[in-house]
């Protein structure tokens, strides 16, 4: 939604002078709440116009949540296959086997116990390497080893069907809607308040406001929605127990996660066991907070440059293009930089030993990943992660702003 790693943009207000001098775009003009469009001709409203009508042009909290929810749904449904591919690559690197149950790797699979969700995997009848085990045509073990992004796509489609690429979409939607619905509106609120404080107390620190506000809002959203994210990762990483049998959904997956640590017989132990639903939250925050910081610090300069090139001719389409492009580039850079933390988060979420899972820290997990796979292990799944994060940030940011604008125009009329 998820990795979605999320960002938000703003309508840009440009101040023009009576002369024909170039347009100057100030950093203070990049505001979600302050930036409203001139309804006539879809032009960009000047700063004085915004200051004059700020109270009546403010977007309400409900409208912001609705806009964010729409952006989250579009992003989650469109980009879920890349999230599945990334999770499969990272899970395999962590030691999870995707081999056929009848293959010679059954000993390693037994480690996960009889309740492990494995599909009755079969290659296509046209596979020249398939052998026969009884009446079942199966491939050798390496047919079920993922070798790269494209290889994961082809093998999932061939062995499990095209629909498996949208495995966990319901959990992704259940996660993305509240996640983005909390993140973007609260980002608006935090930033507006911090901007007021910085202008009064420390004007030189105003440039840090978007980074701080984004980190606070992201931390809040991640903490509230984390159990759903844990269920989504489990659903994407594991395969079904039997072919043709519907796999467990979000609720059953969450129950399964909790059941792994439900061995307590007193209140203190019961409260301790609830920590299992937030397993890996530290790694999630360690990934998402830097992601937000990198994304915002990259997005704003790119957006400013693109809108500066457009100058006075910037309209709705131009703002949408600049917003999406800036979000795409910033999201891609942030996703690549934080990939090791995403690998650590995935490894902690799919850990099957409850005791070990609760004791693992992000630092220990990163050291373990480095020991097992070196630099390649730390950046496992970076391709699909970047391919997902770039469009995801661009879609969420641009869609959020466009829907807010449409809702504002409808309310004004």
Swiss-Prot record:
Q: Where are the Solcar repeats?
A: 59-193, 205-305, 318-406
Q: In which tissues is it expressed?
A: Ubiquitous.
Which residue ranges traverse the bilayer? 65-85, 170-190, 204-226, 284-304, 316-336, 378-399
Keyword Phosphoprotein on entry:
no
Q: Which GO terms describe its cellular component?
A: membrane; mitochondrial inner membrane; mitochondrion
Domain of life, per UniProt, equals Eukaryota
Q: List the disulfide bonds.
A: none
Entry protein name? Mitochondrial carrier protein MTM1
């Amino acid at each position: 939604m998820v990795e979605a790693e999320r960002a938000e943009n703003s309508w840009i207000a440009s101040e023009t002078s009576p002369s024909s001098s170039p347009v100057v775009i100030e950093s203070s003009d990049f505001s979600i709440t302050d930036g409203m469009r001139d309804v006539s001709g879809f032009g960009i409203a000047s700063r004085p116009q915004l200051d004059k009508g700020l109270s009546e042009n403010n977007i309400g909290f409900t409208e912001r949540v609705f806009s964010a929810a729409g952006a989250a749904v579009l992003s989650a449904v469109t980009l879920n296959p890349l999230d599945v591919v990334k999770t499969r690559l990272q899970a395999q690197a962590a030691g999870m086997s995707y081999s056929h149950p009848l293959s010679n790797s059954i000993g390693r699979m037994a480690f996960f116990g009889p309740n492990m969700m494995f599909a009755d995997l079969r290659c296509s009848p046209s596979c020249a390497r398939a052998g026969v085990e009884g009446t079942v045509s199966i491939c050798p073990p390496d047919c079920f080893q993922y070798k790269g992004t494209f290889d994961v796509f082809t093998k999932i489609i061939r062995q499990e069907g095209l629909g498996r690429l949208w495995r966990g979409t319901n959990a992704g939607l259940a996660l993305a809607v509240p996640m983005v619905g909390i993140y973007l509106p609260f980002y608006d609120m935090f930033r507006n308040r911090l901007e007021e404080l910085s202008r009064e107390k420390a004007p030189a620190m105003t440039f840090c406001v978007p980074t701080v506000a984004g980190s606070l809002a992201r931390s809040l959203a991640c903490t509230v929605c984390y159990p759903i994210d844990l269920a989504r990762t489990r659903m994407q990483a594991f395969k079904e127990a039997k072919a043709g049998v519907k796999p467990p959904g979000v609720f059953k997956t969450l129950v399964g996660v909790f059941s792994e640590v439900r061995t307590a017989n007193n209140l203190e132990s019961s409260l301790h066991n609830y920590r299992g639903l937030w397993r890996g939250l530290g790694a999630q925050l360690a990934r998402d907070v830097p992601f937000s910081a990198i994304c915002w610090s990259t997005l704003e300069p790119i957006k400013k440059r693109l809108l500066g090139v457009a100058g006075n001719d910037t309209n709705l389409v131009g703002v949408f293009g600049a917003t999406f492009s800036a979000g795409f580039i910033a999201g891609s850079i942030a996703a690549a930089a934080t990939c090791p933390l995403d690998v650590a988060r995935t490894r902690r979420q799919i850990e099957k030993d409850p005791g070990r899972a609760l004791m693992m820290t992000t630092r220990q997990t990163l050291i373990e990943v480095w020991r097992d796979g070196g630099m390649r292990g730390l950046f496992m799944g970076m391709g699909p992660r970047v391919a997902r994060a770039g469009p995801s940030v661009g879609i969420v940011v641009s869609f959020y702003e466009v829907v807010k604008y449409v809702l504002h125009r409808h309310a004004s009329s």
